[in-house]
């Protein structure tokens, strides 16, 4: 007699095999049973004859037949179930493994003894398998077969009734087979909560078909057909009608709206709007430019844009030219973008102004769309013959290509035609109820085809495409959706989970796709808006199955109503249809099926197949069918349930990933790897989000374990210890992967293996790897991270608040999160970062997703995050920051400004920065004056714009400030009650420059040759941090928002209370003897930075993450300069933001807070990088209270301090948030203006570190530094940055040696 332990041992390699429920169990009867009966077609004699000829018992034939049925309905190749013994009515387990290399006769032979051992060894009385018996059979399976019952073995009616009762108490489905000369039948008894009667009848008939196929002598399982004639007839009725091909053109349909509603808004973007008239004219301009460059049918044109209204213009322009477009995401690695452009032999790239440099590296020619120059060029075509309706591209021509993850290691391009897109259009428009009142929010990345549907379908319907900025899309999604008055939103269920339907009163329809959605996640939506769930693939023009989710009771149902046809076939043989309810591969037929894969005939022929024979019998004519690779089941009510992927392709947060491609790049990144597996790991209890993990067996870790050991592996035997050597390599490996793959395809964890586990058939046991990895705790996984930290509890209220935020969004307990823990190491990702930012904002913290990426450690994030300031805070009262008589101060200010006393609003001292800048202006009237052209949208309201500028000036006194000199108080700022001077003149250059005592800000409107607005502004009233804020406020004021009052007086009050800086600067400069770099021709030479060089290098995520990017760059330049000078004690100038000052609301004040200070770094060749980083950051942090003193004051603190201020290299780290905070409407590129205004030294370095890219712009004096020298310096800076990021334990001397070896 067997024991429960013996059963567990016998079935340990098998996952539970449960017959699936076909019903939504809510309200279903799960206790009562029903039965159906099917008579066998083959008489008793044929079954017995087959049994005798093959030397197997009839029971074995029936067991294998039931195993085949289970395989079909569960999708599992390893099946197990219970068998009621004929002799003693005990229950024994039966296990059968079906593999493609096994024939039926082999399987029958292996099952001749049901357990492969002595009969009865695994028998257990039914009473022992109940809850009372302490052992549940449902632990392994939920079905049982009882038979054959023949001759004297037939039980009495009483015995049969008792056995049936016992079996039904244990199992959900019992198949009883009675075989005799007089009666041969199958009785299938099932729980009513499992299936309906017609479904049970289909299962019983599938059992009958399986028996029939076995005794007919078929050997290959992929030749077995379990389909009944009833199922075939039903499927044929469902799929009788195919959608027709359309000869219409998308551009024509959109053009109709351009004629009917020219003034209606077609695109509403964060960067401005386009009417349908503008959409037509501008896209036609793009068309003409592209035609002249040879673009036409079957020519693929990459489009590279950040989120922008101009991307829609580019798409439509390519379509009008007859070409096919490919949307690229600039956030993807340049190497991946280049491989896509090479794949399509791109002649040119259509790009935004911001992405032009990146685009230049992808193709030989770049066409700029957007920006003043490009817009003016397109405007030249307005009024020309609009031949956009000329028939250029035929319906079969390519409309677009989408590149998805490919198993060969390179992206594969899916090509869709005009006709396939148009075939999906009618049903899509109807399902989403899109019309000319729809406002569709374009959330998806440009790398995914959903964004194409969001744009083109909306325009075909006459609606408005709403385009958020990248920053709002990630950091403030709720506000962005509200801002646009969104009616339709397409997101993944993961994103929908972080949104609240109550926040969107205008929303009518939400579309969920890209991944499975759980019913409980949809409940909050179905009672507020229409919920559409999309199932589809890029190969089928986005959508092949769609459903409308109605009441909560029906949200599990998915109906395909797209005009195409769906079939379910044997995954190993598409010539065999599956029964209704059985698991099989989904085939899609119809006009929505795409053309195939670009330049990949082999992959295309495997996936886009000719119609199978059974389909050709149904309808005449050939058609292409798409093999989806998805395993699904279709029930008798036409509902579809996704089961899993057939291949190694997975979806993570809605993004399709081919595991083979990731494995390919992991092998390239780890040359020592002998075997590599990448899996999507899902925790059983959902305590952490799904993540990609890479399992690597390398020469260094591999053991000499036997095959037997690899088949019986445990977690202790499989996973290697995370050595220090391994952790030191993780950063480099991850950096290589990020260079080659989008971030969502980079594994979160890389696990080294001792052995690669095998299945019993000696294949890699992916399932076991997944199970073992899922069982690892967060603490276990952290051991495999590159950086190890010890637990430190939060030390202040802000850290405690962020500990709670981390815990809520990551699903962790508080005691699992320390102050030094890394958000992404704990399991965070871009989507949970969005949730974190939203949660923090609700708690009145000023946090963005970019902040989370910049400072992922909890303590760092808390330190860099401020509470939103209280709007009721009092600022210093007017005239209180200058001692003396108010009347006298006002009278002197009015006299010098030549204004009446009544308009003087306040007077306070200048900052040291302002004093220095004004001193330079007195010598050179043009010094530190920026001239910025503000591009004006075509439909700008100039009166409204002028009032918007006035509102910005009223809210920010710094823009109404003049500078005067007082003999008693020195340089003073005078705030006056006036608007910014608005001058209308066609001669911009001849306008009087700003001067002392005069306004420091001017606006000049030019009417000819074209309308343009110019901003002249002195650096004394702005800096690189405040200028984007100013344009953002201008946009808000133009759109009617009220601006908060932000005087500079609070910052001036802080400066007046600064501690004495003498000790700090004297200590920092003491003993400095190194010469400045570069050397000037003579001491009185004034550098003139007339040359420019740029350099960009990809750097890995820093391993010493406790140090800021600014600290890393300072050290990188110090090493570069030390190498060039041959010295270890170097100094240069650096610009600090000044925004670390403890002043409320300083982050939103339009005041120049930057300060220039000397930076001295002494290197030690025997010290590791981390030690020097710590020293640099410590010195900088201690210097925050003293950074506003000014260079003039520092130089008066002694000879050494004066020498430190004689630097000739200035390093400025640009804030990564500047670009993201650019305004929505008046978008202007101010970077060059900023560079020129700051560039007064021999070398001026402007650095930006973002998304692992270090970008450096150098303005330098070409008479002092040669072009070759400057290029070498920039390359060495990039190399040093890479070394510092990748290996903080590396010695400084080793980096200097590596630079020397490059010479």
UniProtKB/Swiss-Prot annotation:
Residue span of region Adenylation (A) domain: 256-653
Record region (Condensation (C) domain): 905-1294
PANTHER family in alphabetical order: NONRIBOSOMAL PEPTIDE SYNTHETASE (PTHR45527), SIDEROPHORE SYNTHETASE (EUROFUNG) (PTHR45527:SF3)
Gene: lpsB
InterPro entries xref list: AA_adenyl_dom, ACP-like_sf, AMP-bd_C_sf, AMP-dep_synth/lig_dom, CAT-like_dom_sf, Condensatn, PKS_PP-bd, PP-bd_ACP
A GO term from the CC aspect: cytoplasm
Keyword Ligase among UniProt keywords: yes
Family: Belongs to the NRP synthetase family.
CDD domains recorded: A_NRPS_SidN3_like (cd05918), FUM14_C_NRPS-like (cd19545)
Record-given protein name: D-lysergyl-peptide-synthetase subunit 2
GO annotation, biological process: amino acid activation for nonribosomal peptide biosynthetic process; indole alkaloid biosynthetic process
One GO molecular-function entry: transferase activity
Keyword Ligase: yes
O-(pantetheine 4'-phosphoryl)serine: residues carrying this PTM: 830
Biological or metabolic pathway of the protein: Alkaloid biosynthesis; ergot alkaloid biosynthesis
EC number(s) given by UniProt: 2.3.1.-
Keywords attached to this entry: Ligase, Phosphopantetheine, Phosphoprotein, Transferase
Organism: Claviceps purpurea (strain 20.1) (Ergot fungus)
